[in-house]
Amino acid sequence: MEPAEPFVATPEDELSDTAKNARDFLLGLTEKMGVPAEIAVGETAEQLKMVLSGESMSILIGRRGETLDALQYLTSLNVNRGREEYLRVSLDTENYRAKREEALRRLANRMANRAVKTGRKVVMEPMNPYERRILHSALQQNDAVTTHSEGEEPNRHVVITLKQQ
């Protein structure tokens, strides 16, 4: 996976009605949660990227990003309701997504080393599809191990095994 492109906010007067409605919807959610936030929106034809800032952003991130993922899901449902073409919605705050991706890549490499050292498969904890994809991608070029996912949602997890020599 390539590193994410730097965020560039779209000026307010250039935002589409869809982007403004998405921002207002998300502002309503954060206010109801008691976490006031400012939201910058970067808009392309395929995606709305929304970056939240303010105090107490850790509340919006939640445990392993679960709250942020839930807010992203709800905002995406709201944005895409009644639309013919799907518009991808991504949320971030305090550069959480990039930090989490880097932490997952380091974890993948540590667990691959463990598999090589012990000669046994390593079963990772359950993760969402996005995080599993990061692990698979991180180890794709590794000559010693291979990865696959097992289980059913929400308990689907990555398994790291030695490549057959």
State each model region's role.
Residues 1-165:
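RNA-contacting regions in translation and RNA-metabolism proteins
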